[in-house]
């Protein structure tokens, strides 16, 4: 069975009950393009001591826990977008920002086709929920709530942990 089918079937049933501005019909004859999004796996430190990574509890559908992020605005660089989104969503200033991977599977978000540029960064303060986040919190990597993650964020975090453990040598996913 298609990997995306099972995971997003439940999302589909939730989505059909939610009114979404993004679900409006495109202009006839307009070219359809994926939506560009960005996320950051934020490593939180207390001085030099690693505390865990930041996750959010989404405040609107699709609900669940997620890596913080959002859409890149027209005229904005991906790097500026991820910094803006982290200020708006979790009230953090990023340090040592590095591009990690690009995720572009068309079914990664059941609402629309999106291309996500994922980064890794450091922060030296605790997150605070804002914007779309109902909650923002730090989770130890051993306590990641795998079954509660939205979108393809379990895959992204598995890739991150592989990279951190040395099982993947490239920051950019092949």
Per-segment meaning from a language model:
Residues 156-174:
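Charged phosphate-binding loop/patch that engages nucleotide di/tri-phosphates or the phosphate backbone
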Residues 9-18:
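Bacterial N-terminal signal peptides
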Residues 49-89:
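Conserved Nudix-box catalytic region and its N-terminal flanking loop in Nudix hydrolases
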Residues 1-9:
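Bacterial N-terminal signal peptides that target proteins for export
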Residues 120, 128-162:
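NUDIX/MutT-family hydrolases
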Residues 92-102:
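A short coil-to-beta-strand element that immediately follows conserved catalytic motifs
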């Amino acid at each position: 069975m298609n990997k995306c089918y099972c995971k997003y079937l439940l999302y589909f049933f939730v989505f059909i009950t939610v009114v979404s501005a993004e679900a409006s019909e495109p202009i006839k004859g307009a070219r359809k393009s994926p939506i560009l999004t960005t996320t950051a796996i934020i490593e939180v430190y207390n001085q030099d001591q690693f505390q865990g990574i930041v996750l959010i509890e989404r405040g609107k559908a699709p609900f669940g826990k997620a890596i913080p992020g959002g859409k890149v605005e027209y005229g904005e660089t991906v790097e500026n977008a991820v910094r803006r989104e982290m200020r708006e969503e979790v009230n953090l200033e990023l340090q040592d920002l590095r591009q990690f991977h690009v995720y572009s599977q068309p079914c990664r978000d059941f609402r629309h086709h999106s291309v996500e540029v994922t980064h890794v960064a450091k922060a030296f303060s605790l997150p605070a929920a804002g914007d779309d986040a109902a909650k923002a919190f730090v989770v130890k990597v051993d306590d990641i709530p795998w079954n509660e993650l939205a979108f393809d964020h379990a895959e992204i975090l598995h890739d991150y942990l592989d990279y951190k453990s040395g099982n993947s040598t490239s920051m950019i996913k092949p």
